[in-house]
């Protein structure tokens, strides 16, 4: 049971971390082209 819980918690944490990074990257990427377009 312990072994099953450890990997389970790690997967959840990893998923959350990846989701956060993906969202941040997406926001930055979208802002970059959006700002360059009007600037151009």
From Swiss-Prot:
Keyword annotations from UniProtKB, A to Z: Phosphoprotein, Storage protein
Role noted for this protein: Phosvitin is believed to be of importance in sequestering calcium, iron and other cations for the developing embryo.
Posttranslational modification: Phosvitin, an egg yolk storage protein, is one of the most highly phosphorylated (10%) proteins in nature.
Region Disordered, annotated ranges: 1-40
Full protein name: Phosvitin
Ranges of Low complexity composition bias in the record: 11-32
The species this protein was found in: Meleagris gallopavo (Wild turkey)
GO function term, MF aspect, one: nutrient reservoir activity
Superkingdom per UniProt: Eukaryota
């Amino acid at each position: 049971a312990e072994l099953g819980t450890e990997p389970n918690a790690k997967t959840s944490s990893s998923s959350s971390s990846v989701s956060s990074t993906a969202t941040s990257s997406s926001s930055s990427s979208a802002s970059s082209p959006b700002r360059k377009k009007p600037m151009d």
